[in-house]
Amino acid sequence: MPSAWAQTPPPASPPAAAPAPPPAWNVNAPGFPSTEVPLDVTEGTWMSVDVSPKGDELVFDLLGDLYTLPIAGGEAKALTTGAAWDMQPRYSPDGASIAFTSDRGGGDNLWIMKRDGSDSRPVTQESFRLLNSPTWSPDSQYLVARKHFSSRRSLGAGEMWLYHRAGGEGVQLTERPNDQKDAGEPAFSPDGRFLYFSQDTTPGKVFEYNKDPNGQIYVIQRLNLETKELEPFITGPGGSVRPTPSPDGKSLAFVRRVRGKSVLFSADLVSGAERPLFDGLDRDMQETWAIHGVYPAMAWTPDSKSLVFWAQGKLNRIDVASKRVTPIPFHVKGTRTLFARVHSPQAQAVVPERFPVKMLRWVQVSPKGDRVVYQALGHLYTRELPDGLPRRLTKQTEHFEMHPSFSRDGKSIVYTTWDDDKLGTVRVVSAGGGEGKVVSAQPGFYLEPAFSPDGRSIVYRASGGGYLLPGLYSRDPGLYVVGKDGGTPRRLSKDGEQPHFGAGSDRVYFLAVEGGEKEDKRELRSIGLDGTAPRTHLTSAEVSTYRVSPDERWVAFQEVFNAYVAPLSRGGKTVVASKDSKALPVTRVSRDAGNFLHWSGDSKRLYWALGPELFSRELKEAFSFVEGAPEKLPEPPQKGLEIGFLEKADVPTGT
């Protein structure tokens, strides 16, 4: 054995210490400049209130903090403070704990603390399907709350979920019938057999604002927790919300709209009789999305003779038998944290003489890469690349210009126009500028025109009017083809978007969208120029744009704003197009977003735009297997070529 191999090696250097993880973000101490402002009030807005099991104390929320108060009124004592938003407090039936909703963990979740405000801890730790409106089971061991589910619209719908007070992922109790009609405000019956909640039961699956509250928007549902039977329990004109069972199990308080007023009612659970108690409530939220409840939570006193509720800025107690209302005075004195507004340190001119044009639309580079065209301020502009000056493509001022696209030889540009009175046209103009020639046969709603590779045909999309637009010339929407010099157009497909050509002039690629309740099916399809032989090539739920390269070897697509490129497969089954696809190699080419995807004439470079910047990337910079690719592929470009311009501001004169 060589002696050098037998030597004792020197001690290895200790591994470098891993960098310390950044501290968790604290809602109550976010690190922003803040100030404390005094708070001294005897009224509040949208306050949920609960009565302690012994009936001697109230707990309520006000401006994101929780307070206790003697039931007769007086000075309120803060249980929680800070920037976190705490709300909807509920005493446990054993009187030892308070459950509440808080965003102190970053989003609305269920929390528990001792009755004196100490030892607060989260019961749930959802980061997306957030929770609110906790209600205790009679044994004080479980909570039921509204869990939030969103889909295609922003606010979504609720389900009732059961959680042990120690935590866990929860048990689903109800299933939302769709993703837009809400449900919430859960409440246990005192024996624990039933769960009441309010639900929007208006017809259809689509939420609509401005529904008629004099009809029936919400009903109170009752879920039998033993048999799982669900039944509409309180129904009728004016709707029914905020179910609140009495401790003796004989009554159910709720809120109903009576003409223009929100009215407190009580229902006898034996006879079914419903009796109005008080018509001075604040307006409930039946006509809108009410993910935190249609009316603030209220509570019975332990003897089931009185209700405590919020209305007109005050806490009130009503004797159910006599309907006599007694205010419960409260005084909250403390502070609130205000954070400094975000603003630019530099003064901004309100009306500058000139302003930068940043909103460039339908940016398209010529096939040779020597010129770019785009729409700005309602008209088309061209600019020589890389450093030319933008100039108007036409000189007309009678209509707006949109959707420009170069011919494959770069000599012509096809585009669409719009006029509020005369509607729209498809036109062709020299890439050097001039007067556009109309090639469409009649006025209409035209979008996304494109030349065939041989320059003889133009495909475009015709849509329809209605709603805010006139309904004329709207009977036959779809994809059309017309000769470059005009003539009678021919419909290729009754639907489709973004028509364009690949290598040949005999086949048109387009995006086909089939709407679904939860997600769309968004397919790359093609059809012969004679309207026959339809094919489906790619499918996705998220892709908003497909663009086939001129040689038909590649496809670019936009998914969740960013741009991606993949080889375009031939034959076989329809391939799923996705940034996470495993069927074919996929590369992200944009860093922030990739709008208006299009290819160079030789299919070696992809272009896109973001605001006033033009970006591009060669395929050899995106895939290591492309000829000429560097050993290490570059990251997506951070900065593009500025192609916008300064425009004189339209400054008003006079007084």
Model regions and ranges:
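Boundary at the C-terminal end of the N-terminal hydrophobic targeting segment
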Residues: 4-6
